[in-house]
């Protein structure tokens, strides 16, 4: 009966969980090249302090979404050369199909051994017993966890246990065109929403932009609610900006951070500072519009900075900068994608557990004191990461310094927070919330009515579970 229930649950959650996802790097960075031969970090020896080698031959499948497959295969080849008793068979699915495919495999009792996971699916998959906690079986995970940005560790933790080692992690960043900002007479980006309003108003008055602010807040954009939540987090010191410890809505209280953001959004929209097209804009069009100089301010996943500042991409290449999220706390949303293993590994016995842990050490952990594979993704493909020591790595600084300010990137990572309320019903509620936020911005309902409707929907879905 439990399996049938899970299968039914999976179908009901199908569309909502996909749409709530932030797709990078499943579909990003937009212009990420196929991997070339890795720099020195790629050809590393076996991980130190690894679990005992498998006694016999072990073959495991590894399921990923379709991004950077050349790099993944090359990393597998290197891992197998160092661990000749272990064979890894790679299988990939598109990001758009990934969640449903994995859920279908799990519900049919045909899971992979190893796979990519995500913070917004962890509650669903771990509560069903499909994934197993890595810190229970792999001795080095605790050491890795101590060096991971808090938001990423939180995103890989369920019921106090760690279920992943980070493959990719990123933050929602406040970005601005420094050349246009200076044209408006400002030398520093806004630190608060009031300053952002003032600067945008001046830029419009001087004819720098018709609409100084642009967001990619189409209801189909997974990054839309994360960007909105980042603004909310930035207005509050500490947690529980959205939900309290009992998962009760906190966002619809008088004077809440969410209410402040909704009122501000309504103001900048009604005064012509926020481009009305924001409510139907997709991320790719957001990047193009910013490159064309049509707007000065935006919020987007950090990986877009590499595309914005790509040489010869436009008149403003090299002029885009990252600022802290405007607000008293400057907190933002961070998200994580990670390597995970299923119960199938444990059921297969000690040799498989040992091999899987060696895999985790090599792909998401350290090799001779270096996060080898994570560093390779960062240097070659510009992917964000959660392993804080890499911010001090000379190769990473050189690579990221081509399109961003590394100290600011690190500061965002340390202040970022995982989304609140990541439950099995979060995805479907998230879809509902997107429409309500837009109604509030458009003035179709008051800010508090929109937030109250979001709270009522949350309570309804929570009760149904």
Regions found by a protein language model. Name each.
Residues 53, 304-315, 328-431, 463:
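C-terminal lobe and pocket-closing loops
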Residues 158-167, 172, 197-249, 266, ...:
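Extracytoplasmic/periplasmic solute-binding protein
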Residues 55-67, 86-91, 113-114, 163, ...:
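Short, well-ordered beta-strand elements
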Residues 1-61, 81, 138, 449-465:
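Short, low-complexity disordered leader/linker segments with a strong preference
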Residues 37, 47, 87, 182, ...:
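Conserved C-terminal helix/tail region of periplasmic/extracytoplasmic solute-binding proteins
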Residues 44, 49-53, 119-172, 197, ...:
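Hinge/lid segment of periplasmic solute-binding proteins
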